[in-house]
Amino acid sequence: MDYQAILETIHRDIQPWLGKGRVADYIPELAKASATDFGMAIVTPRGEVFRVGQAETLFSIQSISKLFACTLAFQLEGESLWQRVGREPSGNAFNSLVQLEHENGIPRNPFINAGALVVTDVLCRRFVQAETAMVQFMRRLVDNPRVDYNPRVALSELEHADRNRAMAHFMRSFGNLHMPVETVIDAYCRQCAIEMHCVDLARAVLFLANGGVVPWSGERVIETSPAKRLSALMLTCGTYDAAGDFVYRVGLPAKSGVGGGIVAVLPGEFGVCVWSPGLDVSGNSLAGLQALEWLTTLSGRSIF
């Protein structure tokens, strides 16, 4: 499969989509991004790298971090993690509080904000500095010691995290948050402020495409069965309340973030990351979604 030719076709045809959508502005540091930016990269388990556009421009991974935090928490807790967070699509916005009261403080899944806060609570109990553990985990996945979080973005998020604080206090009232709220919020904001580029993020998700094993290091991150199940969660819950439409159009397990990035995997074949900061109404990259739809259409490859 000539993935480089496919990426170049996508890069050519995506131009009219750039500049559309709305850059996330509820976090002031993210509002500085340009909706005309675009990068895309594919990495295979054999080490092949295909890229176009600004594929090595750093951006804030935001909710993409939830995938890796969940993986790290599952390493530590195993199946008991699911006693505190569900595995069902939400159908509501990623920062909604609506379902928490009806469901006794148990978030629907680990990829909405409430679920991610529970996951971060797990990490805060297990590590002295959960955000440092996350950064070290990401560095290990991509073999890049320069991966880090942006303190300006983290501070900007901390100053505008009232809704997340409300969720955290609410879940704590149900006994589903064990660490102090500010400890969890601080770690969560720093985790979301990790900066990476498309090539490294495509590389970071490859363990899911490779049965839970990092191809170049041989490190087993999680067992094969949990890797499949985590991919299933990405498929059903990874793109906010637009997961159904995403699966219909793209057909790959994916996780998006309001920084404009989307990562996806095709088991046995590749990890892919696309980045363009202009977002649709659900908080997914407008051009990124279109690019991934074209990728699976032009390659004829999806999980279906």
Curated annotation (Swiss-Prot):
Keyword Metal-binding: no
Entry keywords, A to Z: Hydrolase, Plasmid
GO molecular function, one term: glutaminase activity
TM stretches of this protein: none
Catalytic reactions on record: L-glutamine + H2O = L-glutamate + NH4(+)
Catalytic EC class: hydrolase
EC number, UniProt record: 3.5.1.2
The keyword Acetylation is assigned to this record: no
Disulfide bonds: none
Taxonomy, superkingdom: Bacteria
Pfam families: Glutaminase
Binding site for substrate: S63, N113, E157, N164, Y188, Y240, V258
Biological process per Gene Ontology, one example term: glutamate biosynthetic process
Complexes and interactors: Homotetramer.
Family the UniProt entry places it in: Belongs to the glutaminase family.
Name this polypeptide is given: Glutaminase
Organism: Ralstonia nicotianae (strain ATCC BAA-1114 / GMI1000) (Ralstonia solanacearum)
Classification of source organism: Bacteria, Pseudomonadati, Pseudomonadota, Betaproteobacteria, Burkholderiales
Gene assigned in the entry: glsA
